[in-house]
Amino acid sequence: MEAGAAGFATSFAVTHRGADGKPIPSRWAAADEIEALCKAVGDSGRGVIGVNGGENLSFADCYELQPKVGAPITYTALLTTSQGTHLAAVEVHKEGLRQGVDVWPQVSCRPLSFSMTMVEPFTLNTSPIFAELMPKSIEERREAFTSHEWRNRVRVGWENKQGLIPRWDSYEIMDAPSSPELVGRRLTDIANETGADPFDLLLELALLEPDLKLRVKAMLANDDADGVAMLLNTEGCTLGLSDAGAHVGQLCDAVLSTDLLGSWVRDKKVLTLENAVHKLTQVQADLFGFTDRGVLRVGAIADIVVFDAETIAPGPVRRVVDFPANGERLTADQPTGMHHLFVNGIEVQRDGKLLQPALDSLPG
C-alpha cells in the first residue's frame, strides 16, 4: 500500500483453478491470513479490498470481515441466478447497510455467458472430475469423454453440488466444423429431436472434432432482465464484472458502460442518465479513494468521455487471432455514439480513431 497500490484483491471462487486443475493457492487461505492481509489495507487509511467469494470466504462473510479490517470491501459479484440466490444476497446486503457495514456488491447490466471450446470448458472445469483433465493431452481427454464411467462420475459430482451445475437449455452451438448445420441451435433442442441426453450429446459432438474444438456459448447468470433492473437500483451496490481482460477468448464485457447507457438508460429507462453516469464515475472513484477523479469541477483531473446519449451502443463483438501461438481474443472496439475521449485534459481519441501524438505524450 505504501508503494501506491489501490488495495488488495483475492479469490476463493470455484472457477479459479491453475493449469494443473488444482485450486489456486488463495482458495486454501486460512481466516487469520485473510484478515491480516485485508487489515493492512485498512491500516493504510485508504484503498479497497476486492473479494471473489467461495467456500472459505463467502459473500455473507464479507459483512463480518469488513468492520474488523477497516477498509471498504467490494465483492464479485451479485448477479441474478435461476435459483434466486441473488434475492437472499440482497437481503443480507440490506441488513449490512442498516448496520453501517461498508460492503459494496458488484452488479452488472451484462448477462454472464462464456463462449468456450471443449478444450477449455471454463464453467465445466469447476467440476473436480472435469478439472482432472486440465493438464491432460487431447488424446487423454478424448478417452475420458468417450468413457461412460467417466461421464457418470461427472453426473454424480453434479448431484452432490460439486462445481457449477450446467444450464443445458442455455447452451448454444457456436462453432462445429464437423456439424455446421447445428451452428446457432440450442443444445436441448437438438437433444429433444434426437432423444439424447444433453450432456452425452455435448460430448459426442465434441468427439466429432479431431481437436475437440466444438465451441458452445453457455449462460451462467444475470439473464433475468427484471432482476438485473432491481440490482442496478439497489442501494450500496457498484458496477463491476466487466472482466477487464480476463477470459479474453471466452467473453468480452468491456462494453458494460456503453450497454448501460444505451440499453438500460435510453431504451429500458431503468436508470436516469445522470444516475448511470454517477455510478460509472464518482461512485467508483470514491469507493477506491481516487481523489480529484470522477467529477467535473475546476482543479479535478480531466478524464472525460463525450458521447451522444441518443446513439451510444456497444457495437459488435468479434473474434480475432493475434496472440502468441495463434491465441484468440474477443474484442468490441466499434461502439457507436462515442465522440471524444480526454485523458488528463488531452484528447486521445476522436470518433473512434486514436490520436497517436497525444498518446505518445503519455497524458495519464
Task: Please identify what each model-predicted range represents.
Residues R185-E193, P198-A229, L260-T311:
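C-terminal helical cap
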Residues M1-L65:
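Hydrophobic, small-residue-rich alpha-helical packing segments that form membrane-like cores
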Residues A13-T15, N56, T80-T81, C109-R110, ...:
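Short, glycine-/Ser/Thr-/acidic-enriched flexible segments
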